[in-house]
Amino acid sequence: MPYLLAAEADKIQEFIFRSSRLREVVGASQLLTRFCQSVEDTLAKRYNAQVVVNDGGSFRVIFDTGEQAVAFGADLAELYRLALGGSLTVAEPVELNGNFRKANDEAGHKLRWAKSRLQGVMAEPHMPYVAFCASCGVGLANTRGRLKGRRTAQRSQYLCETCQTKTAERDRKPRALL
């Protein structure tokens, strides 16, 4: 009997807009679309699966057996984590008794239930002795200082060399460039 598997990326907006402090956020949605298309070309073929939906971080895939669906879901979540650095929720497979609409509704319900449950701890790579700049969010901080003219001027913040140079320039206390 065929089975329908539903899976969906977690915190999709966070993934797409993670670089919002940069001047331009480019490439996240294209990267996600490319990942979804590559699943059909590689992983789905390995499991002899029929991909129904695979875009925007959402998947609906039909399998011959429930065991295939479960194994595919585990591999898909791991590949998503390795390729894009995020997590993917995979619902329990649903029997497909000839009525796709009913099975899809049930798969969607199981997916929402799975997303609402805490599924475990995701290890975040970290460097305990390194801080990112509080101003730009990109550079590695090398000092702790205050940014004048901000509401947070009373608090010290981690700052990178570039932001310190920009702050000094703005405050008309230019540093030697060379």
Task: Give names to the regions the model predicted.
Residues 1-178:
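Regulatory and interdomain segments flanking nucleotide-handling catalytic cores
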